[in-house]
A protein has these predicted regions:
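C-terminal accessory region of radical SAM enzymes
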Residues: 164-177, 197-226, 245-304
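Nucleotide-sugar-dependent
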Residues: 229
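Short, surface-exposed beta-strand/loop micro-motifs that present aromatic residues
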Residues: 236-238
Length: 313
């Protein structure tokens, strides 16, 4: 098990330091969410929830466009993007701004409960590159236990509607990914899930549960920290809250460790400051010198996924 995980991350070059600028940037355009999911710490998040101001958002996007327009940019961090589908600015304007600046890999993550046909149209019009939809069950009974407050049939209809609309408009974007976080409650549904959604034309993403840096239980994290290797998220990802704080990694929902703020500094400056020091500790195996949150975390072994599709990926 250990060698399989480690070898896969090495093969995907996920353990390399990204260098002077991150390969992945998470932008917390909105930190509010409409569900209470069992695999997510969001419902217990203590920091104030909000919406990123437009001037801060554009500052971030403008720098990415100059430094690395091919970086993967997640236009949502801890919330659901369609909470701001009717605000000013809204998520569609934010997508369009990023694409107009030349970004090549603008993506969203959503539970899809707030989607509808209009949302699908606007995502395609804005030029979104990919959308990842959290749908961790093949049966409605399992779904409602895991994604509390969600409507399974509505989500399935929304995903199928987006796939159908892409065909009608002969659009190859956005890539539609359905994500399944494997847990005891749903693991027997994986095969049916993979078969059904692959046949519908979606790309299936199967991934392990994370503990959000020790905040919830993730019993399938069976490797001990004495066997650890550098964390993929630490090596390649810059995570920015709606206030501009740069936190330790995507698992730091409560902003327990703040490396800097991109209102006061550039992304590049923050990336090459405290975060670079932490990356060096990872690369040299000095894990005992990391901040406590990172030192005790076991999510380094969960930074991986398997993908399935009937079409070449």
């Amino acid at each position: 098990m250990e060698n399989d995980i480690y070898s896969k991350q090495l093969q995907q070059k996920r353990l390399d330091d990204a260098g002077d600028f991150p390969k992945v940037v998470l932008v917390d355009t909105v930190s509010m969410c409409n569900l209470r999911c069992s695999m997510c710490f969001h419902q217990n998040m203590k920091r104030k929830k909000g919406i990123m101001p437009w001037d801060l958002y554009t500052k971030i996007i403008d720098e990415i466009a100059v430094e690395n327009k091919d970086a993967r940019v997640w236009l949502v961090f801890f919330g659901d993007p369609f909470v701001i589908k009717r605000t000013k600015p809204n998520i569609f304007e934010e997508i369009a701004y990023a694409k107009n600046k030349g970004l090549t890999d603008a993506v969203l993550n959503t539970n899809a409960n707030l989607m509808d046909e209009e949302v699908s149209h606007r995502l395609i019009e804005a030029g979104l590159d990919a959308i990842y939809i959290g749908l961790d069950a093949f049966n409605a009974e399992t779904y409602v236990k895991l994604r509390v407050g969600g409507d399974y049939q509505k989500v399935v209809a929304n995903v199928l509607g987006l796939l159908r609309l892409k065909k009608e408009l002969t659009s190859n974007k956005p890539g539609v990914y359905v994500q399944f976080v494997v847990m005891d409650e749903n693991e027997k549904e994986v095969d049916d899930y993979k078969r059904f959604w692959s046949e519908q034309g979606a790309i299936v993403k199967i991934r392990p549960k994370v503990s959000w840096a020790g905040m919830i239980d993730a019993p399938k994290q069976i490797l001990d920290n004495k066997d650890r290797w550098p964390c993929h998220w630490a090596m390649q990802t810059l995570s920015i809250t709606d206030t501009g704080d740069v936190v330790l990694c995507p698992c730091d929902l409560d902003a327990r460790f703040v490396a800097g703020n991109v209102r006061k500094s550039t992304l590049k400056e923050v990336w090459n400051g405290k975060l670079k020091e932490l990356r060096t500790l990872h690369l040299t195996g000095q894990y005992e010198k990391l901040p406590e949150m990172c030192r005790i975390c076991r999510d380094w072994q969960s930074a991986r996924s398997d993908y399935y599709s009937l079409n070449p990926l």
